[in-house]
Amino acid sequence: MVRTTASFGTSSSFVLRLGQTLFSSASLLFMCFNDDEDFYAYTTFCYLVTVMGLVTPWSVTLALMEAYSILVKKLPMQATVISVIVAGDFVLSFLSLGGACSTASVAVLLMDAGEKQCDRYKLSATMAFLSSFLSFASTFFNFCLLPSLMSH
């Protein structure tokens, strides 16, 4: 079995998962802790909160699996498990990218709403972008691991 640099069960993959967890949690917190009463009037903000609410537990769960795999060094690598992880990362990375793009565009349009709120929305969109890129990287590395698992 050929392992790539950040494939499932390696320490670099664990770091990717921790980064996803950190950035998705930060994005969620920046969106939720605001004092703007019109927050729920914008669908894009609610969408980003929903997506980051999905990405955070996904990343935490996989980070725990990665940590267990690194510590025990005996987690069986099955093609179906890695396929589910690749599919989940792929879907969630596109959902978070869409949420980040829509939030960033609405934040730019709402510049007259006040600097404090727009800066918070832009910061949340930036954290969502970073989480999305780490999820794309994780998808790519685990996808490269799949052919070697299929041959066994």
From Swiss-Prot:
Membrane topology summary: Multi-pass membrane protein
Disulfide bond annotation, renumbered to this chain: none
Spans within the Cytoplasmic topological domain: 1-12, 66-80, 148-152
All ranges on the Extracellular side of the membrane: 34-44, 102-126
Origin superkingdom: Eukaryota
GO cellular component, one term: plasma membrane
Protein name: CASP-like protein 5C1
Organism of this sequence: Arabidopsis thaliana (Mouse-ear cress)
